[in-house]
């Protein structure tokens, strides 16, 4: 799937970028995932922009650079910006402005370690939700009555129950998974 997109786009595409791009239409459909609570004014703020933070491990600890206006960027642009910001964070040369303004966070714990056991991530306040993905791995699946090895990606979400109820979260994740399972759709969302 990724190789197909890379061929079509003519550039390297990360799995994190693919999931981030898939999040955009799901966030538009379920906008409370892209909202926050303004505690001072006791109100819900629905953000017009989709600014997706991505958790980045550095020697100095966790940093969360933000892809601002991700909904206005191509898949190739998102992937390139993730690479640039992650490298700046690891070198401790990232601008503070690039660590602010996120409306939701994506954590790719699958890029580290050989095990994919992961707890529930903590929401990055004041955001309403965080999505965590594990590594892609072959798992048994039944296809046309046959058991075959199929690449799978596990994902979990944590969310602020003051904004998002369980059914809304399940529908959001279902939509996100449907988009990821049809990678050709990623090119059509912007």
Predicted regions and their residues:
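C-terminal catalytic/motor cores of large multi-domain enzyme assemblies
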Residues: 1-190
């Amino acid at each position: 799937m990724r190789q197909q997109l890379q061929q079509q786009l003519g550039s390297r595409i990360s799995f994190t970028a693919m999931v981030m791009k898939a999040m955009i239409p799901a966030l538009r459909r379920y906008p409370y995932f892209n909202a926050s609570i303004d505690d001072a004014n006791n109100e819900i703020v629905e953000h017009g922009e989709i600014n997706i933070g991505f958790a980045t491990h550095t020697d100095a600890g966790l940093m969360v650079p933000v892809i601002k206006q991700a909904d206005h960027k191509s898949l190739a642009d998102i992937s390139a910006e993730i690479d640039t910001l992650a490298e700046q964070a690891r070198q401790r040369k990232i601008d503070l402005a690039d660590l602010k303004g996120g409306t939701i966070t994506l954590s790719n714990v699958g890029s580290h370690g050989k095990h994919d056991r992961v707890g529930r991530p903590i929401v990055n306040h004041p955001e309403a939700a965080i999505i965590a993905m594990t590594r892609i791995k072959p798992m048994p699946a039944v296809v046309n009555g046959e058991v075959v090895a199929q690449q799978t990606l596990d994902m979990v979400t944590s969310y602020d129950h003051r904004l998002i109820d369980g059914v809304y979260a399940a529908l959001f994740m279902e939509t996100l998974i449907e988009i990821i399972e049809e990678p050709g759709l990623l090119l059509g969302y912007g």
